[in-house]
Every structure is written in structure tokens, then in C-alpha cells.
């Protein structure tokens, strides 16, 4: 037992380290702090809970057991997690008429039988150790001057803040001016969508979520003149590695593919008076989408 003489507060909170072979077991002698468990304790108890299912055990212990930023584990089995969730839900329930009790909520969610929360709620509800989102995924964007550099950076900031809180993010890039269109700065023309795909992708890779990168979905309308560049962006090795990409296809485009006739792309994509218009071979672009999806599983 090691105890610092200039920290008398530790008299009530002594961490005893008991070495048992390779495993170190922390036995907290505090009557105030929450109880902690070793990884081995949690793994073995959870394996018994899941009746020997090693995959379920590993996933729950690594992703959903309550932990703090130091890696200390505060839940021994999913029963502890369900009790935490039930306690917090009951606290909110008490603010409304005819509330469910903690035990009633617990019976609904225990053993993953009737209600199975999403991953983020399982981690975040009642969690006093981490700032975590209570939703798995978010779709973001903004109205108005969204294609300005300030608007593009604002979306980037929103993406990062959501990913810091364990949220997956999706946003559409159809509001960004196509490559070659005029802009009011020294560059004179827009760089198009591809560089901003890389920006958002890099932001995703920079934000670690407990050792794993965040999840990002980028999409574009087939009406956008940069749709082909968007579709090809991930074909170059090492590009846009932090995002998945999807194309929003409309009936008009598919009919043009069937009829083997040209298709008009424009920007803004819904404008009656577009500032940029481009005519393409619909069938050729469709074949490229199919080829890229076959080769790299994207675009979706």
C-alpha cells in the first residue's frame, strides 16, 4: 500500500494494488467513490452472462461497459448497464404524469429482450464520466450561403463536434459550386467538390472515438455538374479514406439511361435559372457508377 503523507484525504480512499500473476486488481477502499472492476473480472462475468458467446462478450466489454477517460471500468455485466439506463430514464419519467418506475424500465430492457437501445444510448444514458451523444447518427447542413468558405468550414466544425461525442455524421455536398464556376475571390473560379470531400474525410480521421475513427457519409445529387468527379474521388488510392460516398439518383436520370439520351446537370441543382449547365451522356455515367461500385463497393 502506498500512501502520500501530504494527502490526508486518501485515508478514506486508498487504492490497494493486489498483484496476482500478470493481472493487477484494484480494490478501492473508498466508501464514497463508485466501485471499479478489472478487465478480467468484467470479461469473465460478461462471458457467463452471454453463455459463452465470445463475440458478444468482447463487443460489450470494449464498447458499452461504463468507463472513464482513464480506462477504469464501472460495470461488470450488461445488467449493470441496463440498471444505469433504467435509473436515468426513470428520473426523466418522474417529471411527467404516470411515470414508469426504475424497476419497470429495467424489466423492459434487461437481457436485450423487448427493447434494445442503439449503441450511443447504451453508452451515453446515465453516463457521468463522458460527454456522449444519445443518437447514433446525424444529418447536418445549413440553409442560405452554404457554399461560401465560411459555410463549408461551419459544417466541418459541426461534423467534428458531433464526432467528438460519438455521433456518426452525414451531409450532402450538392450546395457547393461545381469546378470552374466563378467565385468572388482571387482564385476567380471554384475548385469544385473534390477538395472539400478530402477536407471532411481528414476531419473524420482526426477525431478518434475510443480508438476508432468516426463514421462519415458524403452524398451528392446526380443533377450536380461535379457528380462524376465525386463518383471517381475514391478510385485513387489513399483519397477520401475517412468517408463513404453515395449518389442521389432521380427518376429523370434513370429514364435517360433507359432511353439512352442526354441528361442535363445544373447548379444550383433545383434552380429554374441555373448559373452553370452541363449536358452528359446518362448511360455512360450510369455505367461508371456500376463499375466503381463493383470495383470498390462505392458509391452507394
Task: Identify the residue ranges that each predicted region occupies.
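Extended catalytic cores of very large enzyme megasubunits
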Residues: 1-300
